[in-house]
Amino acid sequence: MGLCCSCLRGESSLEDSTGLPIAENEREAVTSLLEFLENKDQYDFYSGKPLRALTTLVYSDNLNLQRSAALAFAEITEKYVSPVSRDVLEPILMLLTNPDPQIRIASCAALGNLAVNNENKLLIVEMGGLEPLIEQMKSDNVEVQCNAVGCITNLATQDDNKIEIAQSGALVPLTKLARSSNIRVQRNATGALLNMTHSGENRKELVDAGAVPVLVSLLSSMDADVQYYCTTALSNIAVDESNRRYLSKHAPKLVTKLVSLMNSTSPRVKCQATLALRNLASDTNYQLEIVRAGGLPDLVQLIQSDSLPLVLASVACIRNISIHPLNEGLIVDAGFLPPLVKLLDYQESEEIQCHAVSTLRNLAASSEKNRAEFFQSGVIEKFKQLALTCPISVQSEISACFAILALSDNTKYDLLQQDVLKVLIPMTMSQDQEISGNSAAAVANLISRVSNLEKILEYWGQPNDGIKGFLIRFLSSDFPTYEHIALWTILQLFECHNETIYKLIKEDQKLVNGVKKIADENYAVAREYMQDGQDTNIDHNGNSNNIEGNGRSNKQSSEKEDASFELYNITQQIIQFLV
């Protein structure tokens, strides 16, 4: 260690301006330390004689010896990082309070080096290291500031330390140093602020400390690292609803700057800017503002990127933006449909597929014009190809999209002609209740008020026992929601007034018995329910008077009673067709 050794060599160099004599034990420590430093790979400086020699110099009254100890600690810790004891940290923390700036620079560096190790991070904070580090951040010396902030940055990567740091008073000086004209100080400060954004409590502390205006202003920095730290910090801050409200009121230029950063030459800045917009777009006002700020052209380019992180960030962002009905047509007009359909084949990421399907689902519920383009994009055929083989999460989104599309009388015929029943019927057998429920609802919606029953009859018995099999399974499920879907579907089939359908249902004993079983199971509850209402009488033969206009009991009915009555009500309407 050239610098340290030079500080130790020579009698004259050991004298300081005070003219204090060097004690014998200090002279011996210098001699020993010179030997240790010349052969440092052979010694452990964190215990035994090397540590005692360093400690002796730290507690010397001789300024040069103190400097030598600080410089030695800085070099040793840079090369050798391992868990250390209190005996190592105590002299370094002592040096942090030294009035000499060179000593504070070196001791901050040493502490920052040791703070790479997780055990050391905890011990430094436990031993009260934050207070002297905060004082060093307030120094007028840029090097002291830089090393102190660098140490805080390392300490803040340990979760257990973050609350301590947030409550120590460190956030205000960190925020101030984020405006430093020195780029190294600025990088360290913004990096430390970023490390403090990984929990809701700490994010609130940051907002309260006034960090948001600083972070937003630094989005315009020419330094890619500073841009990245600030963009990521703001993205994390935007996770919380209360913070989004704060940003909406106090950061009016935020969206414009983030949209601009989607064109950054730095891939990670571009990605984080998109993620920040995604988080902001959890709120309705931001969904509109991002579009007004010109975000769609950039997003449609990014979802076609070769970078998986960029594709994921951008498709997640457009998914949130597509939630707002006023954005649906603009998204379609911006050319999103073809690349979104292409993303359905993105086998490398289930999450990307999910966001793509979810976005398409939102767009499917828009205007007739957009719905026409939706069908022309080939998305239905792609859904059919994926539906039975894709991951559960993707299948769930596809089933939800089919359920929404099937609600529209204008799209039912197209869906039936594209043979969606071929995949919807097997999906009703899924062990996932959301998938089976959505798929069954889609089948029921397709059947409701349909004039051409050709496809209904074609898929009555196949695949997987067809529509008939789905109805039998749901009638015997003992799950009220499934029973309701099956009963409602049967009622819709009867209301088509098709003799072939009548015959298929009436002659199938499993279907008939399933309906009667549900009627029997819910008769007692329904009768009590109606007696409480006093307006309607029901007999067990299925005759009812003014069922839809029944009175309600003054006491609140339970959800279970409501469900039982509704099930019984539908069974009675079906039984009228069966008799």
Swiss-Prot record:
<keyword id="KW-0926">Vacuole</keyword>
<dbReference type="GO" id="GO:0000329">
    <property type="term" value="C:fungal-type vacuole membrane"/>
</dbReference>
<dbReference type="InterPro" id="IPR045156">
    <property type="entry name" value="Vac8"/>
</dbReference>
<protein>
    <recommendedName>
        <fullName>Vacuolar protein 8</fullName>
    </recommendedName>
</protein>
<dbReference type="InterPro" id="IPR000225">
    <property type="entry name" value="Armadillo"/>
</dbReference>
<dbReference type="InterPro" id="IPR011989">
    <property type="entry name" value="ARM-like"/>
</dbReference>
<dbReference type="GO" id="GO:0043495">
    <property type="term" value="F:protein-membrane adaptor activity"/>
</dbReference>
<dbReference type="GO" id="GO:0000045">
    <property type="term" value="P:autophagosome assembly"/>
</dbReference>
<keyword id="KW-0564">Palmitate</keyword>
<feature type="lipid moiety-binding region" description="S-palmitoyl cysteine">
    <location>
        <position position="4"/>
    </location>
</feature>
<keyword id="KW-0519">Myristate</keyword>
<feature type="repeat" description="ARM 4">
    <location>
        <begin position="159"/>
        <end position="198"/>
    </location>
</feature>
<dbReference type="GO" id="GO:0071562">
    <property type="term" value="P:nucleus-vacuole junction assembly"/>
</dbReference>
<feature type="compositionally biased region" description="Polar residues">
    <location>
        <begin position="534"/>
        <end position="556"/>
    </location>
</feature>
<feature type="lipid moiety-binding region" description="S-palmitoyl cysteine">
    <location>
        <position position="5"/>
    </location>
</feature>
<dbReference type="InterPro" id="IPR016024">
    <property type="entry name" value="ARM-type_fold"/>
</dbReference>
<comment type="function">
    <text>Functions in both vacuole inheritance and protein targeting from the cytoplasm to vacuole.</text>
</comment>
<feature type="repeat" description="ARM 6">
    <location>
        <begin position="241"/>
        <end position="282"/>
    </location>
</feature>
<feature type="repeat" description="ARM 9">
    <location>
        <begin position="409"/>
        <end position="448"/>
    </location>
</feature>
<feature type="lipid moiety-binding region" description="S-palmitoyl cysteine">
    <location>
        <position position="7"/>
    </location>
</feature>
<keyword id="KW-0472">Membrane</keyword>
<feature type="lipid moiety-binding region" description="N-myristoyl glycine">
    <location>
        <position position="2"/>
    </location>
</feature>
<feature type="repeat" description="ARM 7">
    <location>
        <begin position="284"/>
        <end position="323"/>
    </location>
</feature>
<dbReference type="Pfam" id="PF00514">
    <property type="entry name" value="Arm"/>
</dbReference>
<feature type="repeat" description="ARM 2">
    <location>
        <begin position="77"/>
        <end position="116"/>
    </location>
</feature>
<feature type="repeat" description="ARM 5">
    <location>
        <begin position="200"/>
        <end position="239"/>
    </location>
</feature>
<feature type="repeat" description="ARM 1">
    <location>
        <begin position="39"/>
        <end position="76"/>
    </location>
</feature>
<feature type="region of interest" description="Disordered">
    <location>
        <begin position="534"/>
        <end position="560"/>
    </location>
</feature>
<feature type="repeat" description="ARM 3">
    <location>
        <begin position="118"/>
        <end position="157"/>
    </location>
</feature>
<keyword id="KW-0449">Lipoprotein</keyword>
<dbReference type="Pfam" id="PF13513">
    <property type="entry name" value="HEAT_EZ"/>
</dbReference>
<feature type="repeat" description="ARM 8">
    <location>
        <begin position="325"/>
        <end position="365"/>
    </location>
</feature>
<keyword id="KW-0677">Repeat</keyword>
<comment type="similarity">
    <text>Belongs to the beta-catenin family.</text>
</comment>
